[in-house]
């Protein structure tokens, strides 16, 4: 299982990457593996404000449909529109081309509450 050390994580298997004043969000390699082949992704709208812990979309695989939760509170400034035609990018590259959305105006307290890669990995055992 791939687990980049430079990202932050949630217990719900989302990852967060700081990116020059904004934050890129996706699901972990563990999560995509549990879901199986992803066939559809429902994304929030650019301009939406999302609240930490709220369902902000869904990820559908051949096995199940899973809600996607906001790991932090912030404003959606971009979504990965490529996922509309190629949702399987989440399976093949969850930490790069399979990113889901980008947020700004993120509350710093939410970021500091996220898990390091080591702490996230311990929770998987």
Swiss-Prot record:
Post-translational modification N6-lipoyllysine, affected residues: 63
Quaternary organization: The glycine cleavage system is composed of four proteins: P, T, L and H.
Residues of the Lipoyl-binding domain: 22-104
GO terms under cellular component: cytosol; glycine cleavage complex
InterPro entries: 2-oxoA_DH_lipoyl-BS, Biotin_lipoyl, GCV_H, GCV_H/Fam206, GCV_H_sub, Single_hybrid_motif
Organism: Listeria welshimeri serovar 6b (strain ATCC 35897 / DSM 20650 / CCUG 15529 / CIP 8149 / NCTC 11857 / SLCC 5334 / V8)
Protein name according to UniProt: Glycine cleavage system H protein
Keyword set includes Kinase: no
């Amino acid at each position: 299982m791939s687990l980049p050390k430079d990202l932050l994580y949630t217990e719900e298997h989302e990852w967060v990457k700081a990116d020059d004043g904004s934050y890129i969000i996706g699901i972990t390699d563990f999560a995509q593996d549990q879901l199986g082949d992803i066939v559809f992704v429902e994304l929030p709208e650019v301009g939406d404000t999302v609240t930490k812990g709220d369902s902000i979309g869904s990820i559908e695989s051949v096995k199940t449909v899973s809600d996607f939760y906001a790991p932090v509170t912030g404003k959606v400034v971009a979504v990965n529109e490529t996922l509309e035609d190629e949702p399987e990018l989440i399976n093949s590259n969850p930490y790069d081309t399979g990113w889901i959305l980008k947020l700004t105006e993120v509350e710093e307290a939410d970021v500091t509450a996220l898990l390091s890669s080591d702490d996230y990995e311990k929770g998987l055992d």
